[in-house]
Amino acid sequence: MKDTFVEKVDDFVKQHDVLKERSTIVVGVSGGPDSVALLYYLLEKRAAKQFEIVVAHVDHMFRGDESHEDLQFVQDLCKELGVICETIRINVSQYQQQYGMNAQVAARECRYAFLERIMKKYDARYVALGHHGDDQVETILMRLVRGSTPKGYAGIAVKRPFHNGYLIRPLLGVTKEEIVDYCHKLKIIPRIDPSNKKEVYTRNRLRKYVLPHLKEENPQVHEKFQKFSMQMQEDEAYLQELAFEKMNKVITKKSDKQISLSIPAFESMSMPLQRRGIQLILNYLYEYKIPSSLSSIHIDKVIEFFKRTQPSGSLDFPGDLKIVRAYEECSFGFKQEIVSPFLQDLSVPGTITLSNGDKLVTEVSEDIPSNMNETVFVAKYNDISYPLRIRSRENGDRMSIQGMNGTKKIKAIFIEAKVPREKREEWPVVCDARGNVIWLPLLKRSAFAISKETAKKDKYMIIHYKSKESSGRIMK
């Protein structure tokens, strides 16, 4: 075991490849023992490692004069040490009310936004924070008690991407006691935040009542938790990679605001990959800004939702995210405004773009296409009244079906094809000038259509449905 605080931190930094020489480091300094000790450690290494140090401090304005005194303390300390100091005062309570989040999440968002800004300003490679080994123990315990994702159970990361560089925590290998001793040896008198002793917070209760018992069993318990954290992170990285690979085969459609997947294909995945797959979708749609009210319980709800016997249904998630099941497909997307009825003429030849970005393209030809799948409609040119009209469905719509006597309700065709209700309103209905429904793209052709087998030399009107979507990957 190393005798000194500095040597222990040196070993930890080297073991985990925390930071490189000749780098600019933004150090988050609250004025408390942890961040002040981190600052002094980095200053001790500054000359040898050719570090550029910038201190950043946020006054969250939670504690009135006390928090303002913290800011002044940091400014005075930096002046004494000859270090660049960037500070800001943010009314976090106002921000919290404005965006409807708890105080801790609001403070974190404001603080990290400021750190990112300072990182950009000085072209820094790292943001260093003062979390230590006891923090790691408390964090893992708290997440186990409250529930979290597998990534969350791994606790605090030593190093993770942040802006164009990394957020690092060099002190995770030492305890709070060692930090306090280091401050005493340097005759530093840091600021003390009284809220750290309030038992209203889960973390503080764990610190006061649980952590001492763990340290009685093993004084180096923080090292065991740190090892557990690293193993969890390594395992999680591997499972995330597998989940990416599998989900890219499960997803059937993808856009910026919506993802659809095949439920049978999804359920063929193992449960660990299913949970991570749902998390990947949520990360993508929320753009990695997951609402604080979202938890592992929501992921379990989605998995249970897929197992229900009912063929359709929906779930509402925070931030207006809606999850809609329609038979064997499920769509994740943000609630959209009601689709307005539409009507548009389509010339021949010509092209129109639909509201979803897909296109209908018409042509006149004496030859029929070699590929006569559901994306193509062919009729004799003179059998159709022009112009063609593309519209939304209407009550009572019917069409004569190729190879069938009489007519059939459009509604029945949608139901048989298991088209979700919300998609029916935006589905294009192709009519001729007399109002006859001649084609429901991708679903049914009318009696006006000809087949490849019955086609002879003639003049044909051909419509192609061209989708902008391919099988979507959730990896950008």
Swiss-Prot record:
Annotated localization: Cytoplasm
One of the protein's GO biological processes: tRNA modification
Main subcellular localisation: cytoplasm
Signal sequence region: none
Leading EC class: ligase
Presence of keyword Iron-sulfur: no
Keywords noted in UniProt: ATP-binding, Cytoplasm, Ligase, Nucleotide-binding, tRNA processing
SMART domains linked: TilS_C
EC number of the protein: 6.3.4.19
Catalytic activity as recorded in UniProt: cytidine(34) in tRNA(Ile2) + L-lysine + ATP = lysidine(34) in tRNA(Ile2) + AMP + diphosphate + H(+)
UniProt: ATP binding residues: S30, G31, G32, P33, D34, S35
GO cellular component, one term: cytoplasm
Keyword Nucleotide-binding in record: yes
Highest rank taxon of the organism: Bacteria
One GO MF term: ATP binding
Notes on the domains: The N-terminal region contains the highly conserved SGGXDS motif, predicted to be a P-loop motif involved in ATP binding.
Family: Belongs to the tRNA(Ile)-lysidine synthase family.
Function as written in the Swiss-Prot or TrEMBL entry: Ligates lysine onto the cytidine present at position 34 of the AUA codon-specific tRNA(Ile) that contains the anticodon CAU, in an ATP-dependent manner. Cytidine is converted to lysidine, thus changing the amino acid specificity of the tRNA from methionine to isoleucine.
Protein name: tRNA(Ile)-lysidine synthase
Species of provenance: Bacillus cereus (strain ATCC 10987 / NRS 248)
Gene name of the encoded protein: tilS
